[in-house]
Amino acid sequence: MSTGLVDPIRAVAQHAPLAVVRLEVQAPPYALLAKPAIKDIKDLKGKLISLGGPKDITKIYVERMLAPSGIKPGEFDMVFAGATSARASALQAGAVDAAILLPPFNFHAIAAGFNELGLTVDFAPELPFSGTVVNRNWAGKNGPVLQRILSAHLKSVAWFYDPKNRAEAVAMMAEASKIKTEDVEKSYDFFAKGKFFEPTGVISRTKLNALVSAMQELGDLPKPFDTEQLVLAGVTKLGD
C-alpha cells in the first residue's frame, strides 16, 4: 500500500507495468542529526554524513539542505546505509558526524544529546516521499477492489488527522510497531502537525515533476521523461 516512489519510477522507466495512483507522504519527513559538537549545518563541510545510498533520494535531500550554507557536493564525505536504524546506530556509535533519520530515530538521537540541524521538509517541500503503486495488469482486472482500497485509504488519512483519534491512533501504532508509546506520540504529532499525509487523493503534477527532476539530477532517469507514463488513466487523479 505504501512504498517509496523512487524505485517504482525507475522500474517504469525500464518498462515495468507499474503506475502511481496516490501520494501518501507528500513531503520528506527526514531530519538531519549531528554529533553534539556540531551546532550548525555549515559545520558539516568536510564531515562524514550517513545517507541511504549513492543514488538514493536521501542524497538529494542532504545536498539540498547543505546548499544554502554554501556546502557543495564533494565538500563532504558520505557513507551509505539503506535503513534509518543503521544510520542512527552509526551516529550514536560515533562512526559518522551526521545522519539523515526518520522518526522516531531522530527523537532518540535528540534525547541522547545529538543536535537536530534541520528538517528536510524545510529545504525540499516539493519532493514527495511515498505513495501507492499498483501493477497495471492487476489493476485492469480488479478495478472495483482497487477503488475500495483507495477509498479506505482516504478515509484513514482523514481519521488520522482528527485530533479526537490521537489516543487511539497512538495505541494502535504502539501495539503494531512495538515501539514505546512516548516515541509513537512524538511521531504522530510530527506527521499530523506537519500535514505529511496527502489528504485529498489528488497527485500534484508539480510534486511529481519535481521528483522526476531530482532523479534526473542523480542520473537515474533519461531526459526528457514524460511523467504521464507514471499514472493510471481513470484511477490516478492529477492536479496542479
Model segments located where?
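Pocket-lining segment of extracytoplasmic ligand-binding domains
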Residues: 7, 85-176
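Residues within well-ordered alpha helices
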Residues: 10, 65, 108, 172-173, ...
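Residues at alpha-helix termini
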Residues: 14, 69, 112, 177, ...
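Short, hydrophobic secondary-structure boundary micro-motifs
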Residues: 20-21, 118, 169-170, 200, ...
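Secondary-structure end/capping motifs
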Residues: 140-221
